């Protein structure tokens, strides 16, 4: 049985992840962390029913991970929190599933450095839904055939999302750019902005949109639009818990959803 910890346990994604841990076989909740609701039963906070796992202060993470015999921590928080959590989790010899987005290059290096230094494993992905990772593969294939077309990415999310563009939009841009040997990214346009051989990236924020990503390949006289829509955050939570089960048999190092889907 895999013992899983959840950071941001009181949050929207934290609660969904806990629900999915309860539903899946081969994994159980062993620890939960947050800055609020400390000492409360996490099941009551998540409204899943009493689980006999209390929410712990993140300041006590190292001790709690050891005492609870946690094998893997699932982290969907914010970039500064994940950067602070990663060295603690890796230092305790515990694997990590990271769904946080919006990292700077320096923050990403800090996280990966902690994992490599401690010989643990991590899956780092901007999106854990199976559908969106198939979406990336479709974009890769399409770009091979439409390399001369203009490429624009439009993403839309709820009005509380903290980072823009989304990690998924950036991953889509990177996949296309790598396929085409490198492209500049342009974020929105204003004023006189003649188009060059670039990938345009645009962010929309409004209402309760879970996550829409559209990639437009536009040529003379025609265009192709490839779109992924998330109807529920449960697609992300379910994929993250499956990744936590998968990583139990993975070797040390940094892994992606490509590794999981390909195995």
From Swiss-Prot:
E.C. number: 1.17.1.8
Annotated GO biological process: diaminopimelate biosynthetic process; lysine biosynthetic process via diaminopimelate
Residues that coordinate or bind (S)-2,3,4,5-tetrahydrodipicolinate: 158, 167-168
UniProt xrefs under Pfam families: DapB_C, DapB_N
Active-site residues, as the UniProt record annotates them: 157, 161
Record keyword NADP present: yes
Class of enzymatic activity (EC top level): oxidoreductase
Cellular-component GO terms for this entry: cytoplasm
Compartments it resides in: Cytoplasm
Binding-site residues, NAD(+): 8-13, 34, 99-101, 125-128
Signal peptide boundaries: none
Keywords for this protein: Amino-acid biosynthesis, Cytoplasm, Diaminopimelate biosynthesis, Lysine biosynthesis, NAD, NADP, Oxidoreductase
InterPro entries: DapB_C (IPR022663), DapB_N (IPR000846), DapB_N_CS (IPR022664), DHDPR_bac (IPR023940), NAD(P)-bd_dom_sf (IPR036291)
Cited function: Catalyzes the conversion of 4-hydroxy-tetrahydrodipicolinate (HTPA) to tetrahydrodipicolinate.
Family, as annotated: Belongs to the DapB family.
Name of the molecule in the record: 4-hydroxy-tetrahydrodipicolinate reductase
Gene: dapB
């Amino acid at each position: 049985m895999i013992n899983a910890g959840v950071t941001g346990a009181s949050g929207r994604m934290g609660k969904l992840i806990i629900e999915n841990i309860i539903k899946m076989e081969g994994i159980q909740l062993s620890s939960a962390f947050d800055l609020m609701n400390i000492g409360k039963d996490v099941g009551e906070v998540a409204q899943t029913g009493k689980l006999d796992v209390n929410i712990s202060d993140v300041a006590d993470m190292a001790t709690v991970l050891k005492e609870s015999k946690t094998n893997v921590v699932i982290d969907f928080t914010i970039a500064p929190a994940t950067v602070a959590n990663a060295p603690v989790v890796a230092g305790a010899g515990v694997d990590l599933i990271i769904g946080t987005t919006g990292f700077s290059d320096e923050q990403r290096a800090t996280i990966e450095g902690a994992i490599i230094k401690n010989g643990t494993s991590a899956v780092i992905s901007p999106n854990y839904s199976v559908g969106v990772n198939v979406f990336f593969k479709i974009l890769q294939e399409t770009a091979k055939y439409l390399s001369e077309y203009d490429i624009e990415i439009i993403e839309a999310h709820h009005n509380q999302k903290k980072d823009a563009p989304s990690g998924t939009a950036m991953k889509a841009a990177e996949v296309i750019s790598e396929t085409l040997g490198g492209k500049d990214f342009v974020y929105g346009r204003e004023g006189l902005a003649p188009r060059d051989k670039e990938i345009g990236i645009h962010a929309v924020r409004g209402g309760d949109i879970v996550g829409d990503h559209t990639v437009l390949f536009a040529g003379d006289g025609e265009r192709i639009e490839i779109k992924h829509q998330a109807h529920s955050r449960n697609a992300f939570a379910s994929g993250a818990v499956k990744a936590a089960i998968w990583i139990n048999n993975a070797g040390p190092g940094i892994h992606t959803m490509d590794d999981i889907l390909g195995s």
